């Protein structure tokens, strides 16, 4: 007796890829000597679609390069002052993406264009990070920020330099082609200066060692980046990323660099009883001294010559004065005052902050030496009680923060009710 069920199973056709039989799938398409099911076709389509999207996003970024003037005007909408730095960044970024076009062009005439990474030097809160962030948003390219203080030489406790690339990959969902058109900002770069000007017999794993490790990465190499981040080990998978197409912007405050510059500029002056007094010698401000920086000063500070060579474009950001801080508070598109006014608008309340109060906030930030970074915390403290009580209050039309609000730390604003009668909060 023949077992029919057994014969039926044997005659079933199977997908050559997933090995599911024709009863387990909706459709089975036959080829010359193979079969493919509808599920495998769908999977293949998804893979091809994803690759096409990756390529299209890469080439879209590649083709649309704003002119230096357009980049400058956009930066001008969000950052107050720093005109020279904005001009330097605009030209450098335009040339960088023009270089990427040249690399991918069929008309490439075998002339290799070098990469020009940037070094931004300026005090804390002067806009170094904001400049890089605004650039990346405008160009619609992947952007990541890394802190140089966490980096150590390979084999020591801390982060490997490849983690910098890994952060960029995370920002673009591990799309390697897109990551290779990105911008990486390395903050606190001055903190990896070597501990002394002379080479030491002991290893400087978080200073000169990190600089040496960053050399090839910044210049351009095929970096092996661990998929899951962390330390490298032989068993894990690596992603290959060409860093020659990534623009690196390094920034730092370089505290004490002005003293090195001052010492260099006064070297020609003799001292002693018989020395002639140079009447033309002017006492320069710290800001003016920083504008005179040369690569030799950075070497004395602790950066190795090879590292400075990888950052050919150097620009100095000015220290922010009170007038600039007042403008930062109110003029840019995303100015802090406008942000808080929008926040209050969500409660259907208009917020008005008088000029004297804005000047007070700017002066307080100056006294704290925090630059523009300290402005938000000052405003938060100023509006804390008001923001605490406002959601529980009704019928409020306008809140006015005037000079009387800040006198003797009396943080009680003027409230204008919708019934058109002016009152002041009781402070309860």
Curated annotation (Swiss-Prot):
Residues involved in ATP binding: 123-130
- What SMART domains would the database entry show? AAA, ClpB_D2-small, zf-C4_ClpX
Q: Which residues bind Zn(2+)?
A: 15, 18, 37, 40
Q: Keyword set for this entry?
A: ATP-binding, Chaperone, Metal-binding, Nucleotide-binding, Zinc
Asked if the keyword Thylakoid belongs to this entry, the reply reads no
The keyword 4Fe-4S is annotated on this UniProt entry: no
Q: What GO CC terms are in its UniProt record?
A: HslUV protease complex
Give the matching InterPro entries.
Answer: AAA+_ATPase, ATP-dep_Clp_protease_ClpX, ATPase_AAA_core, Clp_ATPase_C, Clp_protease_ATP-bd_su_ClpX, ClpX_bact, P-loop_NTPase, Znf_CppX_C4
A single Gene Ontology MF term assigned here is:
ATP binding
Xref: Pfam families: AAA_2 (PF07724), ClpB_D2-small (PF10431), zf-C4_ClpX (PF06689)
Instruction: Outline the extent of the ClpX-type ZB domain.
Output: 1-56
Biological process (GO), any one? proteolysis involved in protein catabolic process
* Transmembrane residue ranges: none
Q: Which Gene3D superfamilies does the entry mention?
A: 1.10.8.60, ClpX chaperone, C4-type zinc finger domain (6.20.220.10), P-loop containing nucleotide triphosphate hydrolases (3.40.50.300)
Q: Which domain of life is it from?
A: Bacteria
SUBUNIT field = Component of the ClpX-ClpP complex. Forms a hexameric ring that, in the presence of ATP, binds to fourteen ClpP subunits assembled into a disk-like structure with a central cavity, resembling the structure of eukaryotic proteasomes.
Q: What does this protein do?
A: ATP-dependent specificity component of the Clp protease. It directs the protease to specific substrates. Can perform chaperone functions in the absence of ClpP.
For this chain, the family text in UniProt reads:
Belongs to the ClpX chaperone family.
Name the UniProt record assigns to this protein: ATP-dependent Clp protease ATP-binding subunit ClpX
Gene name? clpX
């Amino acid at each position: 007796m023949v077992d029919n069920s057994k014969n039926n199973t044997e005659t079933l056709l199977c997908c050559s890829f997933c090995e599911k039989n024709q009863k387990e799938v909706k459709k089975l398409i036959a080829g010359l000597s193979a079969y493919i099911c509808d599920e495998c076709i769908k999977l293949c389509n998804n893979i091809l679609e994803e690759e096409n999207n990756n390529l299209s996003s890469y080439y879209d970024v590649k083709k649309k390069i704003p002119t230096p003037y357009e980049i400058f005007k956009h930066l001008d909408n969000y950052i107050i002052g720093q005109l020279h730095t904005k001009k330097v960044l605009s030209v450098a970024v335009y040339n960088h993406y023009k270089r990427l076009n040249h690399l991918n062009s069929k008309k490439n005439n075998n002339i290799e264009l070098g990469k020009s990474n940037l070094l931004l030097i300026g005090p804390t809160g002067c806009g170094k990070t904001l400049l890089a962030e605004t650039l990346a948003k405008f160009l619609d390219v992947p952007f990541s920020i890394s802190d140089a203080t966490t980096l150590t030489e390979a084999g020591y406790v801390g982060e490997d330099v490849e983690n910098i690339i890994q952060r960029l990959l995370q920002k673009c969902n591990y799309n390697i082609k897109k990551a290779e058109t990105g911008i990486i900002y390395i903050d606190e770069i001055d903190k990896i200066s070597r501990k002394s000007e002379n080479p030491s017999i002991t290893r400087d794993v978080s200073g000169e060692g990190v600089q040496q490790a960053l050399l090839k990465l910044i210049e351009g190499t095929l970096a092996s980046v661990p998929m899951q981040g962390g330390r490298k080990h032989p068993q894990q998978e690596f992603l290959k990323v060409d860093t020659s197409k990534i623009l690196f912007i390094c920034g730092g405050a370089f505290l004490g660099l002005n003293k090195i510059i001052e010492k260099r500029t006064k070297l020609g002056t003799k001292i002693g009883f018989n020395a002639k007094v140079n009447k033309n010698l002017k006492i320069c401000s710290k800001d003016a001294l920083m504008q005179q920086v040369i690569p030799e000063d950075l070497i004395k500070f602790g950066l190795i010559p090879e590292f400075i060579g990888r950052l050919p474009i150097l620009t100095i950001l000015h220290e922010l004065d009170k007038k600039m801080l007042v403008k930062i508070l109110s003029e840019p598109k995303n100015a802090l005052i406008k942000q808080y006014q929008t926040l209050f608008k969500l409660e259907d309340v208009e917020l008005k902050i008088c000029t004297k109060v804005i000047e007070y906030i700017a002066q307080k930030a100056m006294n704290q030496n925090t630059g523009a970074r300290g402005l938000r915390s000052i405003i938060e403290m100023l509006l804390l009680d008001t923001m605490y009580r406002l959601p529980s209050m009704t019928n409020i039309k306008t809140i006015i923060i005037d000079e009387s609000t800040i006198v003797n730390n009396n943080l009680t604003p003027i409230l204008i009710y919708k019934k058109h009668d002016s009152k002041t909060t009781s402070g309860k």
